[in-house]
């Protein structure tokens, strides 16, 4: 009797079978296209951002090849290429999810922002492979459903009415699915019954170390939204330097954000929430308060951050659908809701660059 295969072999076999099933776009049964299961893509919760990972990154934003990530948005004119010789896109990437994890926010934002290109940045290999496979499966599902809908529409006597009915159901069905779908269903979800705006062609994920190479991917004022959802809190004081929110990184985020752009943050750790507010100049720490009282020369240490960002009011956040998706669609957000924990949200708007003094 042969022993059962080891876990690593089972994971590799499952991943290979899933990739083959997704790539076979000519299959007749759309129900065969299933989303990947997380249990075959397990990895440690942390990755050291200071290690020298084997990462590929462009020399500059003008050298980045986005054509393989967004094939539906590639410029049809082959003469339009970037400095690396890759095909250009019809539009630039303008929404970034830093530390995208298993891609819950990407999936939730895709139908909400169908005209915007969204990218997730993740440093862990297995997690990125899961997200990539998940996006490919969702695209294949939408492609099959779109073909089936087109066939049914052609055979119908009133195609315009049928298409209008389908288009009218898209937004409501997708919003209801995002709000009501439980976390376990994301691993076993089968073929959807309605088309999704954008067909998930506007989302992708890349492996990158944001703390080191963020400016290599995005040009000045390129982005309209940046999401940092449930980042690693790094509780130990000696690990605080690895936090994704810092004065140095905030300056890089401000460089890539266009004036009026938004930076979204959410965490379930209250101490980290106050850390975020302090590093965006909204709150003062104990040392800064004492320096401010003593009129020390270092009292304006966060003056630069205050000139670049302002906090968005709670009234505006209640009207922002991206905040709802950030709370409900992410895997960490669902876990916090199951555990009845608190979610601390802070959104900051990029100010207009101050004018040079005359």
Swiss-Prot record:
<comment type="similarity">
    <text>Belongs to the class I-like SAM-binding methyltransferase superfamily. TrmB family.</text>
</comment>
<feature type="binding site">
    <location>
        <position position="99"/>
    </location>
    <ligand>
        <name>S-adenosyl-L-methionine</name>
    </ligand>
</feature>
<dbReference type="InterPro" id="IPR025763">
    <property type="entry name" value="Trm8_euk"/>
</dbReference>
<feature type="compositionally biased region" description="Low complexity">
    <location>
        <begin position="151"/>
        <end position="186"/>
    </location>
</feature>
<feature type="active site">
    <location>
        <position position="232"/>
    </location>
</feature>
<comment type="pathway">
    <text>tRNA modification; N(7)-methylguanine-tRNA biosynthesis.</text>
</comment>
<keyword id="KW-0819">tRNA processing</keyword>
<dbReference type="GO" id="GO:0005634">
    <property type="term" value="C:nucleus"/>
</dbReference>
<dbReference type="Pfam" id="PF02390">
    <property type="entry name" value="Methyltransf_4"/>
</dbReference>
<dbReference type="GO" id="GO:0008176">
    <property type="term" value="F:tRNA (guanine(46)-N7)-methyltransferase activity"/>
</dbReference>
<feature type="binding site">
    <location>
        <begin position="209"/>
        <end position="210"/>
    </location>
    <ligand>
        <name>S-adenosyl-L-methionine</name>
    </ligand>
</feature>
<dbReference type="GO" id="GO:0030488">
    <property type="term" value="P:tRNA methylation"/>
</dbReference>
<keyword id="KW-0808">Transferase</keyword>
<keyword id="KW-0820">tRNA-binding</keyword>
<keyword id="KW-0694">RNA-binding</keyword>
<feature type="region of interest" description="Disordered">
    <location>
        <begin position="1"/>
        <end position="29"/>
    </location>
</feature>
<feature type="binding site">
    <location>
        <begin position="330"/>
        <end position="332"/>
    </location>
    <ligand>
        <name>S-adenosyl-L-methionine</name>
    </ligand>
</feature>
<protein>
    <recommendedName>
        <fullName>tRNA (guanine-N(7)-)-methyltransferase</fullName>
        <ecNumber>2.1.1.33</ecNumber>
    </recommendedName>
</protein>
<dbReference type="InterPro" id="IPR003358">
    <property type="entry name" value="tRNA_(Gua-N-7)_MeTrfase_Trmb"/>
</dbReference>
<keyword id="KW-0539">Nucleus</keyword>
<dbReference type="GO" id="GO:0036265">
    <property type="term" value="P:RNA (guanine-N7)-methylation"/>
</dbReference>
<feature type="binding site">
    <location>
        <position position="229"/>
    </location>
    <ligand>
        <name>S-adenosyl-L-methionine</name>
    </ligand>
</feature>
<comment type="subunit">
    <text>Forms a complex with trm82.</text>
</comment>
<comment type="function">
    <text>Catalyzes the formation of N(7)-methylguanine at position 46 (m7G46) in tRNA.</text>
</comment>
<keyword id="KW-0949">S-adenosyl-L-methionine</keyword>
<dbReference type="GO" id="GO:0043527">
    <property type="term" value="C:tRNA methyltransferase complex"/>
</dbReference>
<dbReference type="GO" id="GO:0000049">
    <property type="term" value="F:tRNA binding"/>
</dbReference>
<dbReference type="InterPro" id="IPR029063">
    <property type="entry name" value="SAM-dependent_MTases_sf"/>
</dbReference>
<feature type="binding site">
    <location>
        <begin position="122"/>
        <end position="123"/>
    </location>
    <ligand>
        <name>S-adenosyl-L-methionine</name>
    </ligand>
</feature>
<feature type="region of interest" description="Disordered">
    <location>
        <begin position="151"/>
        <end position="194"/>
    </location>
</feature>
<keyword id="KW-0489">Methyltransferase</keyword>
